[in-house]
Curated annotation (Swiss-Prot):
Gene: ERVFC1
Miscellaneous remark of the record: Ortholog of the human HERV-F(c)1_Xq21.33 envelope protein.
Organism this protein belongs to: Gorilla gorilla gorilla (Western lowland gorilla)
Keywords attached to this entry: ERV, Glycoprotein, Signal, Transposable element, Viral envelope protein, Virion
Location in or out of the cell: Virion
UniProt similarity note: Belongs to the gamma type-C retroviral envelope protein family. HERV class-I F(c)1 env subfamily.
Name of the featured protein: Putative endogenous retrovirus group FC1 Env polyprotein
Region feature (Truncated surface protein): 23-179
Signal peptide boundaries: 1-22
Amino acid sequence: MARPSPLCLLLLLTLLPPIVPSNSLLTEPPFRWRFYLHETWTQGNWLSTVTLATVDCQPHGCQAQVTFNFTSFKSVLRGWSNPTICFVYDQTHSNCRDYWADTNGGCPYAYCHMHVTQLDTAKKLQHTYRLTSDGRTTYFLTIPDPWDSRWVSRVTGRLYQWPTDSYPVSKLRIFRTYV
């Protein structure tokens, strides 16, 4: 059997893909999903909106929950309330989904599904509860399913000062965009 010529070996090496792993698998993609949390409230005759927080998904997608960290809600005084959030999308009872949704955001009745702030000084409850607080300076709002398409089209919720209040004090909007 004849040995291949050096020219033939050189040609073969240039045509074969490299065996060394590509760095493209190790680099972060140039774009990622970013979540925004906005609060809108009325103060006197003025309607105000502010971005409370943003959070990015992991570089290679939104496969795991994301958590907003922010210092306060603008429409609620810390220490004088127990902030509670209601979303229409996670209501299971028709009375909570279908009646006064624009006004109450899914919580016209006490039996509706509410996300009441849970005190979490050890930061261990964020996987169990949607809304937690360290009791001093920070609130944590967790999105358990960031891959769901509803977050692209903006999810609106209502913020209540207390879980027993009849009407919300502000509107929350959560959405994600590709940045």
